[in-house]
């Protein structure tokens, strides 16, 4: 089966990484039919580079979309997928500007897909993701539902001993979407801006079919450490509460709000976690905004803002 695939990459101020990544797609054993780069208003020369890159031709169609402002990963992938759907591609492959594809990443995905039975039950596929330490298990997860809450369980080493296995959640690093899936579920929620957009989209994908992780199709994505910028946590908290409310019964959202409040807003957060008053206030606002659907870029907590 010969399938056409459009690659979508979102970039923001990582020109050095982007150059390396784009070269790797030229080296694929199965070439994409097109590659779309969404530039989230980078300020490091990305605009000029992409204008030259797309005019130089290559082994597939090149397209650069320059946003006038930073739309976050959620907004970037949303407009990238929307543009890809204007073509006649059968699949859309999503990844980051600093995620390096092995030369046969697409070949392996299609090789296993073509051998699978009941292909109509498969909504998306995804790669294994490695970092500098080995397999990065957090990129692929399972969901377990309890009476009041859900648990996300990261994949484990034993899962990767099989040629492929099913997952419930994927990140947008090495995700291969069927065109028919996007036609059914629409685009990622651009109003999430950053964080939880991939989990929310995965949940919609799973409502239409399986997500299959192919273990010998490999992306390498560096682990960036555990340090979190405090302004980002506003979006993490807000979007998680909103996501749970969208896809699970009300009691799950109530539990999610309570859990976030205890960990990030309560006396426990102040005394045990040493969270500042501003940090706790930010998360209180995030919980409320998630509940009522006040999404988009917050006027109070814009990217890069110091919280204190």
Regions found by a protein language model. Give the residues of each.
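Short, acidic, metal-binding catalytic loop of nucleotide-sugar glycosyltransferases
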Residues: 23-32
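A conserved acidic beta->alpha catalytic loop
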Residues: 24, 39-48, 69, 99
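Glycine-rich, basic loop-to-helix element that forms the pyrophosphate-binding segment
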Residues: 66-87
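Short beta-strand-to-loop acidic/aromatic patch adjacent to the donor-nucleotide binding site
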Residues: 88-98
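Conserved donor NDP-sugar-binding/catalytic core segment of glycosyltransferases
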Residues: 104-140
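A short, conserved alpha-helix in the catalytic core of glycosyltransferases
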Residues: 168-187, 191-217
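Active-site donor/metal-binding and catalytic loop motifs
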Residues: 210, 214-230
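Non-catalytic, C-terminal membrane-associated alpha-helical segments of glycosyltransferases
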Residues: 234-239, 251-308
């Amino acid at each position: 089966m010969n399938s056409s695939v459009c690659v979508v990459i979102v970039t923001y101020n990582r020109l050095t990484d982007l150059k390396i990544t784009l070269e790797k797609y030229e080296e694929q054993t199965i070439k994409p039919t097109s590659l779309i780069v969404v530039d989230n208003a980078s300020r490091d020369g990305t605009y000029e580079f992409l204008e030259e890159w797309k005019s130089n031709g290559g082994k597939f169609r090149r397209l650069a979309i320059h946003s006038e402002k930073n739309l976050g990963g959620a907004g970037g992938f949303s407009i990238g997928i929307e543009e890809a759907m204007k073509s006649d591609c059968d699949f859309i492959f999503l990844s980051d500007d600093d995620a390096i594809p092995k030369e046969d990443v697409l070949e392996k995905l299609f090789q296993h897909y073509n051998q699978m039975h009941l292909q109509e039950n498969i909504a998306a596929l995804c790669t294994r993701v490695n970092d500098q330490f080995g397999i990065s298990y957090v990129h692929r997860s399972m969901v377990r539902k309890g009476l009041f809450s859900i648990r996300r369980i990261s994949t484990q080493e034993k899962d990767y001993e099989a040629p492929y296995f099913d997952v419930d959640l994927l990140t947008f690093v090495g995700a291969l979407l069927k065109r028919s899936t996007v036609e059914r579920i629409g685009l990622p929620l651009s109003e999430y801006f950053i964080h939880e957009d991939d989990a929310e989209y995965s949940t919609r994908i799973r409502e239409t079919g399986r997500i299959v992780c192919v273990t010998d199709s490999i992306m390498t994505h560096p682990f960036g450490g555990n340090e979190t910028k405090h302004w980002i946590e506003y979006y993490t908290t807000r979007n998680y509460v909103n996501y749970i409310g969208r896809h699970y019964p009300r009691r799950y959202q109530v539990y999610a709000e309570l859990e976030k409040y205890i960990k990030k807003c309560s006396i426990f957060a102040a005394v045990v976690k040493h969270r500042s008053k501003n940090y706790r206030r930010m998360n209180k606002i995030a919980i409320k905004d998630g509940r009522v659907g006040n999404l988009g870029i917050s006027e109070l907590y814009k990217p890069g803002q110091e919280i204190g």
